């Protein structure tokens, strides 16, 4: 049997598909890649905030809905909190490091004033502004290779990226991992997800064999938070859960650049209930500060 996997045509997307594909091969399943151009690819120089929501996923998911592919593979942080009702999460791979990193000559504490850091994420911009208000940020688009090339050419004095991207691309840049209390990651950062058609029971059963349950539980808890308070690349909210045994450890943060709210939780339970509880804690603190999510 050969499974058709839809994904963006970028180098990173191809690597992510192959990571999932290797898991399939181990259980005797072949795969082929269906390259899809997304709005984010076609307008690669425009700010993400201008392109709207779902810019990395819409066309890829449509290929599955239209029967052109069996599975859509994404970085899970790029998919909306409300998945198309005809689609379902079939599997996630074991999570790569979820952290944000700083690529710069010095660590965050020692950065010079008035330098320019490249990031297109409002979350990263606001967290950085709260900690180091004297540092400038500037939008940067393009794949990871392009961003690093701009940094090396001195167009930027630093970059903030997801550590998982560098790991998957096998890049050996020196970097500084950012503390999760200062830079709480975007929900589902570091997770590769496979979406399929709900009605496709045969393929759903195949993907159960490669699903990493603890990672899925972390992902669902984080998605419960953002479904209450918002999240994603257009949001200044970060959330991260770590599951150890039956215990969930979670943190969620918001910043507008001038003030910052952080809440945490530690308890056993099911992902949705614990994630919702953390989301309500953050929502309550935001309301106390007259912030409307």
From Swiss-Prot:
Cofactor(s) the protein requires to work: dipyrromethane
Where are the S-(dipyrrolylmethanemethyl)cysteine modifications? 233
Q: Which reaction does it catalyse?
A: 4 porphobilinogen + H2O = hydroxymethylbilane + 4 NH4(+)
Q: Does the keyword Transferase apply?
A: yes
Q: In which pathway does it act?
A: Porphyrin-containing compound metabolism; protoporphyrin-IX biosynthesis; coproporphyrinogen-III from 5-aminolevulinate: step 2/4
Q: Which GO terms describe its molecular function?
A: hydroxymethylbilane synthase activity
Q: Which UniProt keywords are listed?
A: Porphyrin biosynthesis, Transferase
In terms of superkingdom, the source organism counts as: Archaea
Q: What is its EC number?
A: 2.5.1.61
UniProt-listed InterPro entries: HemC, Porphobilin_deaminase_cofac_BS, Porphobilin_deaminase_N, Porphobilinogen_deaminase_C, Porphobilinogen_deaminase_C_sf
The record's comment on cofactor binding reads:
Binds 1 dipyrromethane group covalently.
Q: What's in the GO CC field? A: cytoplasm
GO BP, one annotated term? protoporphyrinogen IX biosynthetic process
Family to which the UniProt record says this protein belongs: Belongs to the HMBS family.
Xref: PANTHER family: PORPHOBILINOGEN DEAMINASE (PTHR11557:SF0)
Extra remark:
The porphobilinogen subunits are added to the dipyrromethane group.
Q: Which NCBIfam families match?
A: hemC (TIGR00212)
Tell me, in a sentence or two, what this protein's role is: Tetrapolymerization of the monopyrrole PBG into the hydroxymethylbilane pre-uroporphyrinogen in several discrete steps.
This chain belongs to the protein called: Probable porphobilinogen deaminase
Q: Which organism is it from?
A: Saccharolobus islandicus (strain Y.G.57.14 / Yellowstone #1) (Sulfolobus islandicus)
Q: Which gene encodes it?
A: hemC
């Amino acid at each position: 049997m050969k499974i058709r996997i839809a994904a963006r045509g970028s180098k990173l997307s191809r690597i992510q598909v192959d990571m999932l594909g290797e898991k399939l091969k181990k259980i005797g399943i072949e795969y082929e890649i269906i390259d899809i151009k997304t709005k984010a690819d076609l307008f690669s120089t425009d700010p993400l905030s201008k392109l709207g929501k779902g810019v990395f996923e819409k066309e890829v998911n449509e290929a599955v809905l239209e029967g052109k592919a069996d599975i859509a593979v994404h970085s899970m942080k790029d998919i909306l909190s409300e998945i198309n009702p005809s689609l379902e999460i079939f599997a996630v791979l074991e999570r790569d490091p979820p952290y944000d990193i700083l690529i710069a000559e010095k660590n965050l504490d020692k950065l010079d004033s008035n330098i320019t850091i490249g990031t297109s994420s409002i979350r990263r911009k606001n967290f950085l502004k709260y900690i180091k208000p004297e540092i400038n940020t500037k939008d940067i688009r393009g794949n990871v290779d392009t961003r690093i090339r701009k940094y090396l050419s001195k167009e930027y004095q630093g970059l903030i990226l997801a550590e998982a991207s560098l790991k998957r691309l096998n890049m050996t840049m020196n970097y500084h991992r950012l503390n999760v209390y200062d830079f709480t990651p975007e929900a589902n950062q570091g997770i590769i997800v496979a979406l399929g058609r709900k009605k496709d029971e045969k393929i759903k059963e195949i993907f159960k064999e490669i699903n990493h349950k603890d990672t899925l539980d972390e992902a669902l808890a984080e998605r419960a938070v953002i479904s209450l308070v918002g999240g994603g690349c257009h949001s200044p909210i970060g959330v991260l859960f770590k599951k150890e045994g039956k215990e969930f450890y979670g943190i969620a943060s918001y910043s507008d650049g001038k003030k910052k709210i952080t809440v945490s939780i530690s308890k056993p339970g099911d992902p949705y209930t614990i994630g919702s509880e953390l989301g309500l804690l953050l929502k309550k603190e935001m309301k106390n500060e007259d912030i409307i999510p």
